[in-house]
Amino acid sequence: MKRLFLLSALLGLALSAFGKVEVPALFSDHMVLQQRSTVEFRGTSDKREVTVAPSWGDPVTVRVRNGRWRAGIATPEASFAKHRITVSDADSAVEIEDLLIGEVWICSGQSNMYMPLRGSSGQPVAGSFETALEASRYADRIRMITLPKREADTPQEEFEGRWEVPSPQTALLMSATAYHFALALTEALDLPVGIVSASWGGSAIEAWMSPDDLREMGYDTETINSDPKIEPRRQCSKLYNGLIAPVEGFAARGFAWYQGESNLRTADRYAEQMERLVRFWRTQWGDTKSRMPFLYVQIAPYENKDAAGTEAPRLMEAQIDALERIPNSALVCTTDTGEKSYIHPAAKRTVGQRLAAQALRRCYGVKLPNEMVEGVRFEKAEFADGKAVVTFLNARYGLTPQGEPILGFELAGADGVFHPAEGRIVKSKPVVEVASPAVPQPVAVRYAFRNFTPTNLHNTLGQAVFPFRSDR
């Protein structure tokens, strides 16, 4: 009896620590819920039951187990109607107000996804003044919650934060890439868009992966994570635990990812890492059939201490390779957005809009031509008469600029030494002829295959050309 009494007392103390009914910061005023889905609300309470009552439907009552509860709430079709949800137990209640039903996306990565609209460290975001000035127009169309930087040894459930409504003040602090992505989506779909932003500048992909996957790839996760010389943002699984686990399973349409600059030295394994990361994330969201699209962004060209180096384009190759490994994925081309001296290009609107174009066609049935959505890809190269004749994909309507030298090409002969070359577009064809007086008999051609080199080749709908090498 004494043991039973002691056990009951300890259990009572544990439950009393929870106190009144509570929900994580993810479930708060101004939030957006994914339309036509089941959103799993969760929280704590010291009572037997909790009721979740949405303004659009019947209340759902669930049992509390060990102080915790979960309730699946079905959401209606998207609209601009303002909703509320009441979460209550026998003694207390939480009101979640100004709630919208729309489209939700999880946006993650390193600094080019994290970079706020206001810019950072003397590096601006193009058009930020105009974008922020007009932000209040989208108060009922866009909402964003940004998770604070946090690393953790184990998966976390909660974080400090709140859903923000766009205004000239709040928009400046929002992820510029994610905001422009949301802006393009809400304009095209005429629906509310919610963004869950979870990024950390300078982070390596290993920090976002599962420990099991990393160990299978040969990582000694315990040694790496106990090494004080390795920053947490580069240690194994630390950022998944701190930034993704707290929103794990939150109903969303898909993912947008902008990362890779911190993995230039391990480009040979990056495609497999991407494949494993995406599979793990989808599994944690209960998506075993790859229904949630994974959209990701080519790292931007940047000199990286050596403009002539090839570390960046090799990582870009791995990003392209990952497309073949990852079902329902898409890659945004950024060859034309890079800046030689800044790793954070200002053209965040371009990146956000290109992400949106992929989402619109892939998720929402918007009929956009391939040339408007996909970056231009190398198809083949033929060598004859002292020149390379290069044919491209995703350029059905031709290439531009016509009649001007095309920058960014290089040719090599049998010696394997590459020299700058000039390209000329073959009129009305997705073909460029490339020649160089320094290479009378070329056997290999490259385009934009340096950490940074000026380029100017696009298709007629403005999509840039992915870096490539014919001698891979």
Give residue spans per PLM region.
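Positively charged n-region of N-terminal signal peptides that target proteins for export
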Residues: 1-4
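Sec-dependent N-terminal signal peptides
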Residues: 6-8
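Hydrophobic h-region of N-terminal signal peptides that target proteins for export
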Residues: 10-18
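Cell-envelope and extracellular/periplasmic
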Residues: 20-472
